[in-house]
């Protein structure tokens, strides 16, 4: 599992914009922000921060932060623009599972596709940290490929999270561990 983070000119935030994050698992991201902040302008970059392991351990991470959205003022940018800005700041985007038109797609067919995708192994080598066994991906995010106003977010994005992906009985932040990158894992094998 992961923690969403927002990087923009004022600070780095984790999920909420109530206060900037100072957690130890966002240190690397905050250091990166220091290098980028003067170039962001009105751009806000949103992504998954996979630095800390919690409900899923990823075994094929090349880096710890993956961009999933970019906002400029009151607009969420198109997926093409997200990829452009991510590349501009040398940040990877989250993996694309499918890009297709939804014209004529029924709610039932979309639900079946999303549930099917969620039952597959994750692109980043998903593993249950408690058992060490491989597991399916945490879920699937579906978004409109075009740009849309911030006020229309709920009509353009949805996230499906599989039942039971969180198995810890205590909050992961108490005894967190850093997620190793793929080259670190290969070096140990």
Mark where each language-model region is:
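Short glycine/proline-enriched turns and hinge-like loops at secondary-structure junctions
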Residues: 1, 58-62, 135, 151-154
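Short, small-residue-biased leader/transition segments that mark boundaries at the very start
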Residues: 2-8
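Conserved loop->alpha-helix
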Residues: 9-52
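Short His-Asn-centered micro-motif
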Residues: 14-15, 46-50, 68, 99-100, ...
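Short, glycine-/Ser/Thr-/acidic-enriched flexible segments
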Residues: 17-19, 50-52, 72-73, 146-147, ...
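Conserved, well-structured core segments that form or line functional sites
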Residues: 64-105
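Charged, compositionally biased interaction regions
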Residues: 91-189
